[in-house]
């Protein structure tokens, strides 16, 4: 708490007025950050964009978020603040799943995603794959950023769900 108090220009005693301990501080910061992230996502969804454009807009939010994450974020949170990690992980996967399933259903209805895909299964797989972005061990042999890994994940996901019309639409948007 010393380093946090110093950066904020206040005493530790003042910090303890607002936060019970470091775990409480981390939990509240994570919770607040997740609320902001969910609001950003809901703002994109409220625009009622084409399903492919929606995914690309959400992708921009995710990449900007990933650019602010230190490479050890997930590891440190899991190791030192397991309660905060559990809340973050559960909420993130739940949000990803819910947004994905709605997007897939709209995309199938709109005729840009393959009719034969199962939105529940694809959404579950996707929500679990997003966690892979933070897996430093999986990518330690190559030098890539979180955002590069996420871009490839989205591209792989998109090309797996779109039909021919959706593919043309997606590739055309990629050129812009």
Locate each region found by the language model:
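All-alpha amphipathic helical-bundle segments outside canonical DNA-binding/catalytic cores
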Residues: 53, 91, 109-125, 143-152
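C-terminal peripheral helix-coil segments that are non-catalytic and often amphipathic
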Residues: 102-106, 110, 139-176
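Short, basic, alpha-helical segments at the C-terminal edge of helix-turn-helix-like DNA-binding modules
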Residues: 30-38
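Short secondary-structure transition hinges
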Residues: 67-101, 108-112, 120-121
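Helix-turn-helix
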Residues: 1-24, 28
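Hydrophobic alpha-helical connector segments
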Residues: 28, 41-72, 123-126
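A short secondary-structure junction motif
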Residues: 36, 65-69, 107, 133, ...
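Secondary-structure edge/capping motif, primarily at the C-terminal ends of alpha-helices
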Residues: 44, 73-77, 137-140
């Amino acid at each position: 708490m010393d380093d946090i108090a110093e950066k904020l220009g206040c005493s530790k005693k003042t910090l303890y007025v607002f936060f019970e301990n470091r775990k409480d501080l981390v939990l509240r910061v994570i919770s607040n950050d997740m609320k902001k992230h969910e609001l950003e996502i809901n703002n994109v969804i409220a625009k009622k964009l084409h399903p492919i454009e929606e995914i690309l807009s959400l992708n921009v939010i995710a990449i900007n978020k990933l650019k602010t994450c230190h490479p050890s974020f997930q590891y440190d949170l899991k190791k030192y603040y397991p309660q905060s990690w559990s809340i973050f992980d559960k909420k993130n996967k739940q949000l990803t799943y819910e947004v994905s399933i709605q997007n897939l259903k709209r995309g199938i209805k709109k005729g840009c995603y393959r009719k034969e895909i199962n939105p529940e299964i694809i959404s579950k797989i996707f929500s679990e794959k997003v966690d892979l972005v933070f897996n430093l061990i999986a990518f330690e042999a190559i030098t890539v950023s979180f955002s590069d890994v996420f871009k490839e994940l989205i591209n792989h996901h998109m090309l797996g769900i779109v039909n021919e019309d959706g593919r043309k639409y997606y590739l055309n948007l990629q050129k812009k």
